[in-house]
UniProtKB/Swiss-Prot annotation:
<protein>
    <recommendedName>
        <fullName>Phosphopentomutase</fullName>
        <ecNumber>5.4.2.7</ecNumber>
    </recommendedName>
</protein>
<feature type="binding site">
    <location>
        <position position="329"/>
    </location>
    <ligand>
        <name>Mn(2+) 1</name>
    </ligand>
</feature>
<dbReference type="InterPro" id="IPR017850">
    <property type="entry name" value="Alkaline_phosphatase_core_sf"/>
</dbReference>
<dbReference type="GO" id="GO:0005829">
    <property type="term" value="C:cytosol"/>
</dbReference>
<dbReference type="GO" id="GO:0006015">
    <property type="term" value="P:5-phosphoribose 1-diphosphate biosynthetic process"/>
</dbReference>
<feature type="binding site">
    <location>
        <position position="14"/>
    </location>
    <ligand>
        <name>Mn(2+) 1</name>
    </ligand>
</feature>
<dbReference type="Pfam" id="PF01676">
    <property type="entry name" value="Metalloenzyme"/>
</dbReference>
<keyword id="KW-0413">Isomerase</keyword>
<comment type="function">
    <text>Isomerase that catalyzes the conversion of deoxy-ribose 1-phosphate (dRib-1-P) and ribose 1-phosphate (Rib-1-P) to deoxy-ribose 5-phosphate (dRib-5-P) and ribose 5-phosphate (Rib-5-P), respectively.</text>
</comment>
<feature type="binding site">
    <location>
        <position position="340"/>
    </location>
    <ligand>
        <name>Mn(2+) 2</name>
    </ligand>
</feature>
<keyword id="KW-0464">Manganese</keyword>
<comment type="pathway">
    <text>Carbohydrate degradation; 2-deoxy-D-ribose 1-phosphate degradation; D-glyceraldehyde 3-phosphate and acetaldehyde from 2-deoxy-alpha-D-ribose 1-phosphate: step 1/2.</text>
</comment>
<dbReference type="GO" id="GO:0043094">
    <property type="term" value="P:metabolic compound salvage"/>
</dbReference>
<keyword id="KW-0963">Cytoplasm</keyword>
<dbReference type="GO" id="GO:0009117">
    <property type="term" value="P:nucleotide metabolic process"/>
</dbReference>
<feature type="binding site">
    <location>
        <position position="328"/>
    </location>
    <ligand>
        <name>Mn(2+) 1</name>
    </ligand>
</feature>
<comment type="similarity">
    <text>Belongs to the phosphopentomutase family.</text>
</comment>
Length: 394
């Protein structure tokens, strides 16, 4: 391809896997297929835009026609890293190989960890389950104020959060507790991606979070393609939870989002900006609201809604743009339990520059091929890991 692209847009449909990975059994996953099982469950998905790009050319999905002339280059990617969580998937997409998986705790944290927190702080722990912060604050806030017990909770991600009223646990004490939790969860058996202090104020029935949230994250252990872009003077616009996933490393602008549809609004607004570099969008609702909650109908509706917004995206793309749509892991809502599933992820690569449409790319053996392609496009330092497919885009 003679000219490089001025802008590359990476869209991660969080948890939208496309079929069981060869090593799924090692992760306790059998016959998992996020996209396929959702489509079967609802009697077929109505996603004409993804269909035109070539989604069903990767493998047939009920309700989505195989494109005779797909607009995009298409294949699927296999995760090489030893994990199936959000951080592992995204870090690998940007050129890292993760040997030790981050841990998630869908049933709450083990007694040993809770005991360490209680012994260190002299405070009891209440909660200890996956929950939305506002819900658990409403549920346990009054008990916390009366007893001084710490509200500890998690989410679908590798995270330990501690909520406390600022009049009950002073901020400095809360931060010290979180620093202690960070120190004891850096390695196995806990290996948590993030500890978050969640202070709040107010009276029972009217508790509100304060802006004094503090995150104790893990930074990527090596520079990623995002760092290479930033160091090379390129823009890296992170939309959604991308900046959190990378602890702000390699990000030149961060835009928070409230939902998938807000994420698409923000992304479409970014397409109107004049920039030279990468936009990187994560759409988390698929995973957080529907995958973990095992809600295939809700998941299907969200996929259809996403497809509807692609019309606006396609209208704004020029020959200087490259759009890459993928995922970071699976989360089959028809499967048992509440955890992610080890799957291939789709890869669709489109530009209006492809006058003859796209064709099949070879199967990618690591998500890092995507990051290598971005680095190759912008002539910045290539990651140690991953093989560019830029030359295959004609």
């Amino acid at each position: 391809m003679p000219d490089k692209f001025k802008r590359v847009h990476v869209v991660v449909m969080d948890s939208v896997g496309i079929g069981e990975a060869p090593d799924a059994a090692k992760f306790g996953d059998f016959d998992v297929d996020t996209f396929g099982h959702i489509a079967k469950h609802v009697g077929g998905l109505n996603m004409p835009e993804m269909g035109k790009l070539g989604l069903s050319n990767i493998r047939e999905i009920d309700g989505i026609k195989k494109a005779e002339k797909p607009l995009a280059y298409y294949t699927k990617m296999q995760e090489a890293s030893n994990g199936k969580d959000t951080m592992t998937g995204h870090w690998e997409i940007m050129g890292l190989y993760i040997d030790t998986p981050f841990r998630v705790f869908p049933d709450g944290f083990p007694d040993d960890l809770i005991n360490q927190i209680e012994e260190k702080t002299g405070r009891k722990v209440i909660g200890n389950k996956p929950a939305s912060g506002t819900e658990i604050m409403a549920e346990l806030g009054e008990e916390h104020v009366k007893t001084g017990a710490l509200i500890v909770y998690t989410s679908a991600d590798s995270v330990l959060q501690i909520a406390a009223h600022e009049d009950v646990v002073p901020l400095e004490e809360l931060y010290e507790i979180c620093e202690f939790c960070r120190e004891i969860t850096l390695d196995d058996p806990y290996m948590l991606g993030r500890i978050i202090a969640r202070p709040f104020v107010g009276e029972p029935g009217a508790f509100v979070r304060t802006p004094n949230r503090h995150d104790y994250a893990l930074k990527p252990f090596k520079p990623t393609v995002m760092d290479a872009l930033k160091d090379g003077g390129k823009d890296v616009i992170a939309i959604g939870k991308i900046s959190d996933i990378f602890d702000g490393e390699g990000v030149t602008e961060s835009i928070r989002t409230k939902s998938n549809m807000d994420g698409m609004d923000q992304f479409i607004a970014v397409l109107d900006k004049d920039f030279n570099g990468m936009s990187f969008l994560n759409l988390v609702d698929f995973d957080a609201l529907f995958g973990h909650r095992r809600d295939p109908q809700g998941y299907a509706d969200a996929l259809v809604d996403f497809d509807g917004r692609l019309v606006e995206v396609m209208e704004k793309l020029t020959e200087d743009d490259l759009l890459i749509i993928t995922a970071d892991h699976g989360n089959d809502p028809t499967y048992t339990g509440t955890d992610h599933t080890r799957e291939f992820v789709p890869l669709l690569v489109y530009s209006p520059r492809f006058k003859n449409g796209g064709s099949e790319l070879e199967l990618r053996k690591t998500f890092a091929d995507l990051g290598a392609t971005v680095a190759d496009n912008f002539d910045v330092k290539m990651p140690e890991y991953g093989k560019s497919f830029l030359k295959d885009l004609k």
